[in-house]
């Protein structure tokens, strides 16, 4: 069975992760004690992807929880599904990272990382055929960003051929937690570009907008935002957990979505959007679902896909529906909006269909797109970074932990290169490349 090992780090990562497990347990019919109480064989058919079956028929999540302070983990442990995790898999320090990337990556985090890696190894040995890792973290704080990226690079060393998928919450433009977010995020992106295979980009502002505009919630709480994220996470992985007509795994997803190795930052969307309390009263049709999925207002990161072009995209539909209709709708989207897709990658939209819809819905869809417009987000963080770094503001917190200014400069230029690469492929056309080759051939003669 192709297992996925889930790792969550820092406050944000642990809160999203806890929500994710609530959703997954619900879909697979696992109750708060880890016992199966569902009603469909489909729920158990590929349950090994995320769960290890322990003695007495209990299902234990393949999850590692880490943080540099005990607070968030205590609340996970006392939450509705806190009892199903392996107690040894909670790894935490006492000092906290104080929103400082350097503490998470070099000092405090580095002291704790070996005990995290021990747990990761133990979980990996429990797998028949480990498919890859998924990491939940935010890039604005200290633990999720600093220690999260440290762990990713260590896992990369030890398991170089396994997929590394991250769900990364970027700092949002208007809603800021910490003044040093741009530093932490830039240093993290510097790591993610090199060491992760696929990054699902989320950000609080886009989630706020969705809650506000689409779900009509006056004051969205983090619980509501995390509910949206967990719906998306569950959708991205549903093809792996349930049988379906067109299945995919992490590697297939990567092969279809990543035309160039560095450009692996994806926008995600989910349809139909519902708030936690309300369920949809009428079933959506495949065309409606498709339309909502591709809607720019549905994207969970603050970048507008209409400002760029899609290099590739993938859609996972869930529920009983005709594959033919799905294919027709996806083709329809591409034909009507052909200017938003690069023409030098033909058939760049892949769809998969999975039989099990999420709880309480007849059908749903998850969208993952590799769009050049995501550069808007990197650009925004980069501008904030430069504004502070030019004056060396707050740098002493980082140099005090043994970091060098050089590292900041490198991270900054790596992020700017990334933006430039996205721009280059946004402007590229099929003919232009071809002309250049012809000219080169002529010169060679």
Curated annotation (Swiss-Prot):
Q: Which residues bind Mg(2+)?
A: 69
Q: Where does GTP bind?
A: 11, 69, 138, 142-144, 204, 226
Pfam families xref list: Tubulin (PF00091), Tubulin_C (PF03953)
**Superkingdom of source:** Eukaryota
Cofactor(s) recorded for this entry are: Mg(2+)
Q: What is its main location?
A: cytoplasm
Kindly state the subunit structure of this protein. Answer: Dimer of alpha and beta chains. A typical microtubule is a hollow water-filled tube with an outer diameter of 25 nm and an inner diameter of 15 nM. Alpha-beta heterodimers associate head-to-tail to form protofilaments running lengthwise along the microtubule wall with the beta-tubulin subunit facing the microtubule plus end conferring a structural polarity. Microtubules usually have 13 protofilaments but different protofilament numbers can be found in some organisms and specialized cells.
Recorded protein name is Tubulin beta-4 chain
Q: Which organism is it from?
A: Triticum aestivum (Wheat)
- GN (gene name): TUBB4
